Amino acid sequence: GYERLTINEGFVARYHNNKISISSITSYQYLDDCMTLDQDFSPRSMFTMQQMQKEHTLTEEIVIRNANPLQRWQWISGAFLFGKWLDMSSPVKFKRDGIEGLILHNTNTNIGNVFPGYGLDIPNDSFVIHSEFNIPTYGAALYHQSDIRLGRWNLTAGVRIDLEYTSMDYN
């Protein structure tokens, strides 16, 4: 099955005079979802995985541009920042057919070759292997573009600098 909750919100503020126009765009997104999959895709009761994630994303962009569209030199400059915080859990649940067919059969076949007469037993009908992830991502960008009209010609030049950082903690 699959369940999802998403919340999005944004805010825009603008300032304008006869020389410049400034705008600020702020957004927030919250995501909470849960997906359960039969990982072996067979009629046997092998194992399932459940992936649950909660994500918060915050962005901010500030844009400054000249306000007179009739000027020969048109320009735009801006800054963009974002942060994303993702917490994800992906537990895998081994069921009886998976324990016997994937784990015990393979393990006991190989243990018997090295230690004759010994083997492994898992009496449980199921067990869970937990996987927890924390994945923050941050980014920033600065940009500028200039357009100069030269008669019938239009000269455009721009530059953008992007920085991004991400990490992952796994338990």
Language-model features: where?
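Outer-membrane beta-barrel domain signature, strongest for Gram-negative TonB-dependent receptors
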Residues: 1-76, 82-87
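Signature of Gram-negative outer-membrane beta-barrel scaffolds
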Residues: 76, 81-171
